[in-house]
Structure formats: C-alpha cells, structure tokens
Amino acid sequence: MTTILKHLPINQRVGIAFSGGLDTSAALLWMQKKGAIPYAYTANLGQPDEEDYEAIPRKAMEYGAEKARLIDCRKQLVAEGIAAIQCGAFHNTTAGVTYFNTTPLGRAVTGTMLVAAMKEDDVNIWGDGSTYKGNDIERFYRYGLLTNAELKIYKPWLDTDFIDELGGRHEMSEFMIQSGFDYKMSTEKAYSTDSNMLGATHEAKDLEFLNSSVKIVNPIMGVKFWDENVVVKAEEVTVRFERGYPVALNGVVFDDSVELMMEANRIGGRHGLGMSDQIENRIIEAKSRGIYEAPGMALLHIAYERLLTGIHNEDTIEQYHANGRVLGRLLYQGRWFDPQALMLRDSIQRWVASEITGEVTLELRRGNDYSILNTVSDNLTYKPERLTMEKGDSVFSPDDRIGQLTMRNLDITDTREKLFNYVETGLLTSSAATGLPQVDNNNLSSGRGLQDKRQ
C-alpha cells in the first residue's frame, strides 16, 4: 500500500507545514480551492529571520485553513543540538571547519513534533515544501512515518496538477492576487536561506557556482567578518559545562536552555564564529554546496572539546570522534532516532559527556579566529607536574623509562625485519641515504604505485 499520494485527496484533512512564505501560502489556498480540507502547522524554531510567529497561523486561516496551530519546538531543538555537541555528531568538515548539522537537527524536531500535533487533530495526511532533489524530502518522510505509522504523504510539489497551474513563483504570486490577496513576492536573493535557532543554511542559485564565495552572503546570525570595514572587537568569553551540559556564559547561569543558546548565538555572532563553506554529499550521493552559520553551536563545541581533550584518555577521544562521525552521518540522513543512532548517542553521553565539567575561557576575534585562554576542571587528567621539563619530583624515574624503552626492542626488531622483507618483494627500495627501505617516490609521482610493483 503506497504512502505517497500523487494527487490531492478531496474532502480529506491535509496537514501542511506552513511557513507563511509564498510557496506554502499558495499551496494551502490552492488545496482549499480544489476541495481538500487544509490544516496548517507552523514550527517555532527560533528562526533568526522571523519577526512575528503569531502572525503566521493567522495568515493560514485567511488563506483557507480549517485550523492553524503554532507549535513551539525551541526547547526540543536546543536539547537535540546539545546532544549533537555532546556526541560530536558532525561529519562534514573542510580543513577543520565544521558544519554543525543544524538543518538536519531542525528537520528531526519539526518532522516529529508537527506530525504528532497533526495526529492530535486526526490529520493523517502531511505535506511540506521539500523538493524531490534534496535531503529534506527523505528526512521528513522518515520522521513522519516513525511518528505516525498511518501517515500518508501528499506534496503539492510532486503533484502534476499543482505544477501545471502554479509551477513558478510568478504564477503563485498571480494566483494569490487573483484570489483577492495583495501578495507581493519578496525581492529575490542570489541564494536561498533556511534557518532555525541553531544555525542558518544558505544555498542554491548563485551559490551553486563555486566561484561565488561567502562574500555574496548577508549573514543573519553573524557579521561579515571578511569585510575590513566591519568593526569586530576581540572579546573574552567563559563557557561552563556541568556533566556535559552548558550551564553558564560569562558567569551568568541559565536555567532556560533556549535562553542560553540565544545568548551563545549573540556572543558568537558578533564575530562571525561558526561560518563554514562546505561541499557535501546529499543522501542521494550527489554533491551540493552550502554556506552555514552556527555561532552558538560553534562556541559551545569549542569549549566542550577543549574540556574533552583534557579529561579523557586517547582511546576514549578516538572513539568519540569515530562514533561521532558515524552519528553525524546518520543525523544527516534523517536517522537521528533510529536504533543505531540511539545506541551511539547513549554510549557517548553516558561515558564521555557525563565527565565534561569545567570552564573554558576564549578570546574571540574575527570569524573562526580564536584563542583558548584558560581551561579549568576538577576532572582534568592533564597534570603538568607529571611531565614537567623542570628539575623536581617526578612520577617515574630515568631507570623506569630505560626499562620501558628496552621493552620496545622486540617490536623494533620485528619491524626492521619486515621492512627488509618488503625490499625483497619489490614493495620498497633500499636507501643508502637513510639506511632504511623506502617507498619509491619517483615511481609514485610518475603514476606507478605499489600495485604496479606487485605485478
């Protein structure tokens, strides 16, 4: 039995994720005129570019919605964002600059909370504005069906009748005007923007071309730190964590996690912290490009990982990074609530995040330029007296180290024998300069690698 409806279901309740923009406004009005019973659901995600959330449901009612609801998703969104920080659930990085998966986090919250609200209203058909080429269509599909097993999916943008009548923004605007609504299209930007309180995504249009840089973007959460005319003053900030959770900024304790994230955004945003330019692999394996903002997430992430490296041992940190990358990819794919993701989340939060208690002081400058000024924690295993280069008491003696090095002789002997065995098989070549077998870089640079030598 199919879950995707290709044509508008007449005389049935159809829920639509309603943003108040031209696309969803025209879709809602069109569905109502064609005989469906539209219900509008708007997620309050703390979007930095939204001025009046309360006005959005009122618009939906004007356009013909049977019912319109505003769902406050902010607290849940921040909870999921902090969980992602605790787990390092970020897999897209370029030269150490991270994308904080803010859109996938928003979809996880929206896709579950809106469908749960629809279920309360006995609405079992859902539509949203995602296109068939992107990631969101699959994310919403998964989260929707996980939340309501009886859910059917109807998307106007997959309905040929809708596309034939209102296939472009101009046609949508004319349709609204002809229907008695003085709806004017907003000025077209050179790119598309989607945001929530964790971060903003800028993509498409001019940004699809790699010779269009971050410089064409007007940040909505930060500043144009690349513009020399923009004054950005250095600023010190202290972040405190308790058992993996951020609790204070600059000595101010926040009981409300939403307010803490908003303040972190304000602090990081003053510097353009957390902006990144990424080429990534969509769920369908095609590459796309996005420019991202996430000032608060970046600030908390830096402080969290500073404490992490001072508290946990090398093997734990390695597992944190490895599992975090896997978890980040699952999040990106719309699998944040799947068992394989929950397993990784639980283990990292239980055994890694629970020990992250302390304070980190940073100096923020322009963009992602910062310095760590101080790190304080009762849980630090970093203890300078253990390895001090100065004369004094030590936890081990020179004789202890001699014994430890002597134990390495077995491994060194075995390794040396293997290297010379590789010379005999042709995998390595002898080197008079170093006395050790070496990879033949001349062969590698001419296009011949180890596989050629095996033949």
UniProtKB/Swiss-Prot annotation:
Amino acids binding L-citrulline: 99, 135, 139, 192, 201, 203, 280
InterPro entries on file: Arg_succ_synth_type2_subfam, Arginosuc_syn_C, Arginosuc_syn_N, Arginosuc_synth, Arginosuc_synth_CS, Arginosuc_synth_type_1_subfam, AS_cat/multimer_dom_body, AS_multimer_C_tail
GO biological process annotation, one example: urea cycle
Superkingdom, taxonomy of origin: Bacteria
Catalytic function, reaction form: L-citrulline + L-aspartate + ATP = 2-(N(omega)-L-arginino)succinate + AMP + diphosphate + H(+)
Region (Disordered): 434-455
Residues annotated to bind L-aspartate: 131, 135-136
Enzyme Commission number(s): 6.3.4.5
Keyword DNA repair: no
GO cellular component: cytoplasm
GO molecular function terms attached to this record: argininosuccinate synthase activity; ATP binding; protein homodimerization activity
Keyword Metal-binding in annotation: no
Compositional bias annotation for Polar residues: 434-448
Pathway in which the depicted protein is active: Amino-acid biosynthesis; L-arginine biosynthesis; L-arginine from L-ornithine and carbamoyl phosphate: step 2/3
Keywords noted in UniProt: Amino-acid biosynthesis, Arginine biosynthesis, ATP-binding, Cytoplasm, Ligase, Nucleotide-binding
Location within or outside the cell: Cytoplasm
Top EC class of this enzyme: ligase
Major location category of this protein: cytoplasm
Subunit structure comment from the entry: Homotetramer.
Family named by the database record: Belongs to the argininosuccinate synthase family. Type 2 subfamily.
Protein name, per record: Argininosuccinate synthase
Species of the source: Yersinia pestis
Gene: argG
